[in-house]
A protein has these predicted regions:
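ABC-type ATPase nucleotide-binding domains, specifically the catalytic core motifs of the NBD
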Residues: 53-61
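C-terminal portion of ABC ATPase nucleotide-binding domains
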Residues: 70, 77-83, 135, 157-224
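Conserved A-loop
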Residues: 7-8, 17
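ABC-family ATPase nucleotide-binding domain "signature/switch" substructure
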Residues: 2-7, 31-43, 48-51, 65-71, ...
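Conserved ABC transporter NBD signature motif
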Residues: 13-20, 30
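Conserved coupling/switch loops of ABC nucleotide-binding domains, chiefly the family-specific signature
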Residues: 11-14, 167
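Activation segment of ePK-like protein kinases, specifically the conserved APE
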Residues: 42, 56-57, 73, 194
Length: 224
């Protein structure tokens, strides 16, 4: 992904986009054309409004709100003391992982690009939150191109083309059904991850001991 964003130049070969060598484009033009959501979200000591519109500084408050709604961020922002004028602590301390992720996605939606790169962007989230966010991503970006880097295969099951990499090399390619039929590396990883997920779902919830209530000599209740 860093090569696509021109943070580095390829040491060998070239990267073509729509038949044109990426090296022919300026760094700024490439980064303006791509919406990038990384694994580690960078939030600044500014208002939520400013943190979202950093991808497009001319955006109005209404446009920022619309992007936040698409990212399922508007509701939690609306319940903050100053809503979009709430000032964030350094690195977004005080927000949950899911809330940070929604702000990052709102940035991407506000940018309104033709190509979105999601680089392990939900790997720090729990399964339920990740599923919710990806369902929203697929709904909002159905008519855009997406490049998704992920280790949790459930998040890329519906992709048109899946490239399986091992030690830096592509070892398999195809959609989910094709790769499962090959019964290769992808199928092995899929079955392993699904087995872990089923095991977690079947594990009983931890038992919480019942409270014991007694009264002391003064008639006051004591809970153990």
């Amino acid at each position: 992904t860093k090569l696509l964003l021109k943070y580095y130049d390829p040491e060998d070969g070239e990267i073509d986009i729509n038949g044109a060598n990426l090296a022919e484009y300026t760094n700024s033009s490439v980064r303006r054309a791509i919406a990038y959501v990384p694994q580690n979200i960078e939030l600044f000591s500014k208002t939520i409004y400013d943190n979202i519109r950093i991808s497009r500084m001319d955006a109005t408050l209404d446009e920022v709100k619309e992007a936040a709604k698409k990212a399922d961020a508007h509701e939690f922002i609306r319940h903050l003391p100053l809503q979009y004028n709430t000032y964030l602590e350094e690195a977004g301390n005080g927000l949950s992982g899911g809330e940070k992720q929604r702000i990052a996605l709102a940035r991407a939606f506000l940018k309104d690009s033709n190509l979105y790169i999601l680089d392990e962007s939900t790997s720090n989230l729990d399964f339920a939150t990740e599923t919710l966010i990806f369902n929203m991503i697929y709904e909002q970006l159905a008519d855009r191109s997406m490049l998704i880097v992920a280790h949790r295969l459930s998040t890329i099951r519906d992709c048109d083309l899946i490239l399986v990499m091992d030690h830096g090399k592509i070892v398999e390619r195809g959609n989910h059904e094709e790769l499962m039929a090959k019964n290769g590396r992808y199928a092995e990883l899929w079955n392993m991850q699904q087995g872990i997920f089923r095991k977690r779902k079947s594990e009983p919830a931890p038992q919480v001991p019942s409270a014991v209530v007694e009264e002391d000599d003064d008639g006051e209740s004591i809970t153990y």
